[in-house]
Amino acid sequence: MARLCAFLMILIVMSYWSTCSLGCDLPHTYNLRNKRALKVLAQMRRLTPLSCLKDRKDFGFPLEKVDAQQIQKAQSIPVLRDLTQQILNLFASKDSSAAWNATLLDSFCNDLHQQLNDLQGCLMQQVGVQESPLTQEDSLLAVRIYFHRITVFLREKKHSPCAWEVVRAEVWRALSSSANVLGRLREEKA
């Protein structure tokens, strides 16, 4: 009986400790999915960047709001989740399906969906750990404004092939940045 009580106490302490930590451990597969998504996104390119120079635009990716050195790990998970969700919304739209190879688009969206599940699992572990700090809200707002600018750009360009190519390249940079953020967070943990 004493062993059972001791075992239960250890489980409770371990559960409490992991819940109260500054975040969660994303599965190793998250990084693999992110790399695969980047590779597929690169394969989706249909036009050369030179042919779309006239359509290039700086969407103002909020790197300073997503950078691991600026926000803590617990704050970065909701921001990365929102970034991934916005990318999925963009590429899962009916306007997107006409622009890309269906097989590559499905693969890309599936990778994003699996990444969202991983990030959502982290968020569930963080429930109750801390309130949404102002910096996190600023970061989430910056990500949403960034994607609003992308959506407006696509609408203004009538979802042209060059507009989608510009957006594809921009999203590739955003996903690369999110991979770098997670890499720095993992280094800090080690």
UniProtKB/Swiss-Prot annotation:
GO terms for cellular component: extracellular space. N-glycosylated. Its main location: secreted. Disulfide bonds join 24-122, 52-162. Has antiviral and antiproliferative activities. Produced by macrophages and stimulates the production of two enzymes: a protein kinase and an oligoadenylate synthetase. During viral infection, mediates antiviral effect, either directly by inducing interferon-stimulated genes, either indirectly through stimulation of natural killer cells enabling them to control viral replication. The gene is Ifna11. Keywords: Antiviral defense, Cytokine, Disulfide bond, Glycoprotein, Secreted, Signal. The keyword Lipid metabolism does not apply. Coiled coil: none annotated. This is Interferon alpha-11. Residues 1-23 form the signal peptide. InterPro entries: 4_helix_cytokine-like_core, Interferon_alpha/beta/delta. PANTHER family: INTERFERON ALPHA-5, TYPE I INTERFERON. Glycans are attached at residue 101. It comes from Mus musculus. It is found in: Secreted.
